[in-house]
């Protein structure tokens, strides 16, 4: 039997669905539940686990022993990949955008503790990460290696994220009107769209872009989900709070107050930014009374240590 499937059954759980109680929701007569993907696994959580699952199974089935991927110095994906490689007995290499001194930060220190080898490259080189010539060279330098794209987004990742909606269709007693996620590379958003097509076609799927100038993702999504237009979905590009990794004072305050009120830990880069956007939409009366909303907690809590180190949060 597959080592990965055996350990999955032992260690990885279906994430719970938690109802949120808040005066804003009561006043506007809307309901909100959070899909707690941050609780899937202690170290490989959230959308990063969803994206990795079928990539890891594919690598195992092919007899491949090493994984390689790309990320920034505080990357949730790199952290999750290192943890997964350690858990499932792969070797792992991370191609890291930035200088070698980042190796001592909380994210990369832990990745190395799990056995990941780091290779630092400058921004110009890093931009080649999707170019075939560059990937071919990496394959020559790292034989018997399975290369996973930055952020983990590919066709196998979409299959993993689809399972969020499949689980929700069994967990929710009533139909979901709106399903929200943060989005960076559009992988999680695309997976939710694909999952909704299969399991919840009347749900509108929303992606809150966490980076500036994210309109290009509207072209990326149909490439990942060719039949995306068969359901209702929307990419919101106006809630980035200054760009990727930017944490405004209002966003930081919201995240802290939300965690205090709900006891649900969130970070301001992805889930916090998404919920802050959702809160503004509710305040503006964008949802009819009786609307049923689900938001996906995509994890990323390991990044809090790095944010504190950078004095951003």
Predicted regions located by residue number:
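PLP-dependent amino-acid enzyme catalytic core
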Residues: 1-313
């Amino acid at each position: 039997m597959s080592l990965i499937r055996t350990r999955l059954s032992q260690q990885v759980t279906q994430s719970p669905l938690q109802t949120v109680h808040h005066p804003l929701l009561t006043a506007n007569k809307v309901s909100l539940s959070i899909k707690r993907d941050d609780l899937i696994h202690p170290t490989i959580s959230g959308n990063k686990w969803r994206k990795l699952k079928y990539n890891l199974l594919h690598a195992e089935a092919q007899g491949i022993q090493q994984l390689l991927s790309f990320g920034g110095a505080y990357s949730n994906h790199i952290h999750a990949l290192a943890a997964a490689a350690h858990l499932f007995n792969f070797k792992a290499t991370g191609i890291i955008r930035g200088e070698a001194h980042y190796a001592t930060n909380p994210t990369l220190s832990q990745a190395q503790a799990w056995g990941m080898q780091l290779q630092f490259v400058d921004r110009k080189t890093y931009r080649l990460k999707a170019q075939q010539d560059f990937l071919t060279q990496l394959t020559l330098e790292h034989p018997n290696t399975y290369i996973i794209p930055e952020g983990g987004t590919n066709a196998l990742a979409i299959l993993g994220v689809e399972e969020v909606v499949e689980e929700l269709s069994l967990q929710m007693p009533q139909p979901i009107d709106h399903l929200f996620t943060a989005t960076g590379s559009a992988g999680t958003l695309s997976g939710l769209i694909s999952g909704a097509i299969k399991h919840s076609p009347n749900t509108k799927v929303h992606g809150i872009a966490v980076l500036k100038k994210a309109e290009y993702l509207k072209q990326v999504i149909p490439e990942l989900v060719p039949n995306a237009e068969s359901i209702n979905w929307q990419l919101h590009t106006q809630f980035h709070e200054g760009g990727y990794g930017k944490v405004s004072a209002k966003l930081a305050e919201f995240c802290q107050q939300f965690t205090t009120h709900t006891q649900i830990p969130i970070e301001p880069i992805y889930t916090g930014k998404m919920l802050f956007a959702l809160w503004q939409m509710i305040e503006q009366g964008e949802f009819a009374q009786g609307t049923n909303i689900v938001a996906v907690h995509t994890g990323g809590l390991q990044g809090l240590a790095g944010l504190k180190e950078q004095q951003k949060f």
